[in-house]
C-alpha cells in the first residue's frame, strides 16, 4: 500500500496544492489528513497566503485523485468541518500491509508509552506537534509527518509517504527529513 499523509495545513492553499501535486505524481491508495486543516489557531501566526475560503474546492480536487481519510484537529471548529467536503472523525483505523495504524491529530493521546487501551504493534500516525517523528518505543510506533505550513524546532515544511512498511517524511524540495521502517507486527526494523 502507498499512503500519503499531511498535517497542520492551517488554511494555507499553497500547502494543499503542493500535497495535491504529490498525490497526482505518486498515485497513492489513500491520503490521510491529520487535522488543523483550515484555521491557524490562537497560538500560531497567520500563515503567509492564508486563504481558508478557497480550500474546500482544493480538497475536492484532492478527493478526485485518491480516497481521503481525515481526522479533526484541535483547531478544526465545527464550522470548519462543515466546509470540508469529506467527513472528519476524531480518529481512524487504517489497515496497511498488516499494520494497524491509528490516525489522529494527536492532541488527546500521550507521546510515549504506556498507551492504555492499545496493543503493542500499534502504529500511531499523528500531527499536532508540527515536528516530524518516526520511532518505535516499547513496541509502539509513532509517526508524524510534521507540518505542511508552520513547522517548528527548525524543521522544514514537510509531508510523508508510507510504502512497504516504511514511513518517509519529505521536505518540499524532495529531500528526506527522516525514514522509519516497521515490520508487520509494528516493531521497528
What residue spans do the PLM features occupy?
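Histidine-centered divalent metal-coordination motifs
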Residues: 10-12, 74-75, 105, 126-130
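Generic structural signal for conserved hydrophobic packing positions in ordered secondary structure
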Residues: 59, 94, 103-105, 146
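Core catalytic region of metal-dependent phosphoesterases/phosphodiesterases
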Residues: 2-96
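Structural motif
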Residues: 3-5, 32, 101-105, 125
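Short, well-ordered secondary-structure micro-motifs
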Residues: 41-45, 80-84, 89, 113-115, ...
Amino acid at each position: 500500500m502507498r499512503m500519503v499523509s499531511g498535517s497542520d495545513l492551517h488554511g494555507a492553499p499553497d500547502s494543499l496544492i503542493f500535497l495535491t501535486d504529490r498525490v497526482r505524481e505518486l498515485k497513492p491508495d489513500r491520503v490521510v489528513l491529520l487535522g488543523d486543516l483550515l484555521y491557524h489557531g490562537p497560538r500560531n501566526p497567520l500563515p503567509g497566503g492564508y486563504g481558508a475560503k478557497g480550500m474546500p474546492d482544493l480538497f475536492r480536487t484532492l478527493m478526485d485523485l485518491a480516497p481521503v481519510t481525515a481526522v479533526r484537529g484541535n483547531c478544526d471548529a465545527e464550522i470548519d468541518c462543515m466546509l470540508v467536503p469529506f467527513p472528519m472523525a476524531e480518529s481512524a483505523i487504517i489497515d496497511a500491509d498488516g499494520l494497524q495504524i491509528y490516525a489522529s491529530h494527536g492532541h488527546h493521546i500521550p507521546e510515549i508509552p504506556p498507551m492504555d487501551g492499545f496493543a503493542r504493534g500499534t502504529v500511531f500516525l499523528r500531527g499536532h506537534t508540527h515536528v516530524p517523528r518516526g520511532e518505535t518505543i516499547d513496541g509502539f510506533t509513532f509517526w508524524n509527518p510534521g507540518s505542511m505550513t508552520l513547522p517548528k524546532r527548525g524543521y522544514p515544511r514537510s509531508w510523508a509517504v508510507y510504502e512497504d512498511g516504511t514511513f518517509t517524511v519529505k521536505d518540499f524540495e524532495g529531500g528526506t527529513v527522516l525514514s522509519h521502517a516497521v515490520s508487520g507486527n509494528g516493531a521497528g526494523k
